[in-house]
């Protein structure tokens, strides 16, 4: 069931599990018969979980978490912090703030192998919900009953434009929908009563390059600005503050390894 939900396709799920599509279909049908529910429905050629299917899926996830917890407990000796851990982070935090924590974790726990995946905040939330990553860090507060979120760092949003250029506020480089930064960029434009032509770019470094070239302006996290940026760009404070949040699935089993990793992620994030 979990693989079908991830793949959004019986055929793709079968390929991922190295089995046949009819076998997957029989397994889902068996679930429906056992629990007397309809698991999936199709709307406009898109497969989605029914309300009963969503409940069943959450129970399956919880069971998987418990099985994973049991296996980890049985393998854990002397609270050793070892093995693999999957960390999902928003682009801004991952590219500009995460290196210090990763370095510290590598020094403290050389047997721990952390696999980092960077994406926008919405995607990281979905990966947490579907148990694709163990821990997530996002750029906005999450309103979801399946997610536990804890603020771990404060951030400041600023407007940037090239110092030497005329006040070009006609073109704004902005992040894609789903990015935590996008929400605050829109708030900043509203606050300044600006209605510029928007160019969507899903990479902050490229956005800054466009601003350095004098092609327009942007609204970004102050933590993304280097000393070179501060020297060449005009930085205007917008009095917009936000937090970065550490997120976990509410049913995630927090073993000793997770506790120690989370503790380090909450430290030295400025």
Curated annotation (Swiss-Prot):
Gene source species = Staphylococcus xylosus
The name of this protein is Uncharacterized HTH-type transcriptional regulator in lacR 5'region
State the DNA-binding region(s). 10-29
Every copy of the HTH lysR-type domain together lies at 1-50
Name the keywords, alphabetized: DNA-binding, Transcription, Transcription regulation
Q: Does the keyword Transcription apply?
A: yes
Output one GO MF annotation. Answer: transcription cis-regulatory region binding
Q: Record's family?
A: Belongs to the LysR transcriptional regulatory family.
Q: Cross-referenced InterPro entries, in alphabetical order?
A: LysR_subst-bd, Tscrpt_reg_HTH_LysR, WH-like_DNA-bd_sf, WH_DNA-bd_sf
Does the keyword field hold DNA-binding?
yes
Q: What SUPFAM superfamilies does UniProt report for this protein, alphabetically?
A: Periplasmic binding protein-like II, Winged helix' DNA-binding domain
């Amino acid at each position: 069931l979990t693989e079908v939900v991830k793949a959004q396709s019986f055929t793709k799920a079968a390929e991922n599990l190295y089995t046949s599509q009819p076998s997957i279909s029989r397994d889902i049908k068996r679930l429906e018969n056992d629990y007397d529910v309809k698991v999936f429905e199709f709307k406009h050629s898109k497969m989605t979980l029914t309300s009963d299917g969503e409940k069943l899926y959450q129970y399956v996830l919880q069971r998987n978490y418990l099985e994973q917890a049991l296996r980890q407990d049985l393998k854990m000796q002397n609270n050793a912090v070892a093995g693999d851990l999957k960390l999902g982070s928003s682009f801004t935090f991952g590219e500009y703030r995460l290196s210090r924590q990763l370095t510290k974790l590598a020094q403290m726990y050389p047997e721990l192998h952390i696999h980092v995946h960077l994406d926008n905040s919405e995607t990281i939330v979905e990966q947490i919900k579907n148990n694709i990553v163990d821990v997530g860090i996002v750029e906005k507060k999450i309103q979801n009953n399946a997610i536990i979120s804890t603020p771990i760092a404060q951030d400041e949003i600023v407007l940037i434009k090239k110092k030497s250029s005329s006040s070009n506020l006609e073109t704004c480089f902005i992040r894609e929908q789903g990015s935590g930064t996008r929400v605050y960029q829109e708030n900043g434009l509203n606050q300044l009563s600006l209605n510029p032509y928007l160019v969507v770019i899903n990479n902050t470094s490229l956005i800054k390059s466009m601003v350095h070239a004098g092609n327009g302006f942007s609204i970004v996290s102050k933590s993304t600005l280097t000393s070179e940026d501060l020297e060449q760009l005009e930085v205007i404070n917008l009095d917009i503050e936000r937090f970065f949040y550490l997120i976990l699935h509410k049913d995630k089993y927090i073993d000793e390894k997770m506790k120690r990793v989370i503790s380090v992620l909450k430290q030295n994030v400025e």
